[in-house]
Structures are given as structure tokens and as C-alpha cells.
């Protein structure tokens, strides 16, 4: 599966030592990727920093999504994933936790750390446990869509996706490009003709 990542830093491989520094961990601990190139360009500029001198667009590949290798933030957790996690933790997940991928991630993290709030440490702990039982990703639509009871889940999943990859070893860089960006209508966009591949 081909996706994109934007960053002000040039690197040869992904690692999670700086996880959360660019966009935070709202959608879990991991390498944040998107199917939408424009979105990666926008996020090549960290929102909390002054305009950085360099910006890079990464084209990457990850193993394909399968029904039991990812969570979807706003959808119920597949039963095989629930079973593997419950077995690893030695306890049953509450019904509320399995109703949405986000709640499940947070429950795992709080269970592992013994806390009542889900923050950075809890998201990291959840990502490590999920990766250890074959759950590689957290997925959410690029354009946020409210999930309703009568929603067509297949149509929801056909929308362009963002993905948090829990283990950086699952991300392979295919191409790196130095890009220039400019701010248009509060969005960072690619300056036409500025792409230059980096070897």
C-alpha cells in the first residue's frame, strides 16, 4: 500500500524517537501517513514551530490492510483483534472499549500503565502491545466523517485514509523529495515546480 509522509527533516528510515512532535498523538502512537499527498505536504510544517527552512515529502509503502491487522478509530474492533488482546492482557475488554478503535486503544494503554487518563505513555504502551499481537495500524478517514448507525462501513473505508503505523519497521521509503511550501488559506501547499528528488 502506497502512502505519503511530510516532514521538515531528511532521513533514510523512520523511527519513533520523535513520535508526537509534529502533530501529536491524537490518533495513536506511531508514524503518521496519509493516502492524500496534499495532506502530507501540509504536515511537512510542524504546527507549533516557525516556518522551517526545509520540507520533505516521502512516498512510502506499508503492508496492505487486512480485516484483522488494524483498528479504525470510529468503528467497532474486529472480534479476532479483541480476542488476541484479551488473551495477552489476561482480562476481558469492556463493551464500551470494543465499540470504537479509539476507545480500545485507550483502554489497552490505561490497563497497561494503571492510569485513568490516556496520554503519551498510554498510547505508546497500547501501540507496542497491539503490534505484538499483529495489529499494525490505526486508521481514520482523511476528511473526518461522523459515524452513524446506518452508515455504509464499506463506503466509509473507501474514503482516503490516514494511518498511524505502530512499528516504524513496517514503513519502507520508496522516494524522498525536497519540496517548497507556501501558506494559502491557512493550509501549507506545494509550490509548483519545487519538487526535487533526494537520493
Regions found by a protein language model. Give the residues of each.
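Active-site rim elements
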Residues: 30
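Active-site and NAD+-binding cores of ADP-ribose-processing enzymes
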Residues: 1-26, 34-37, 44-199
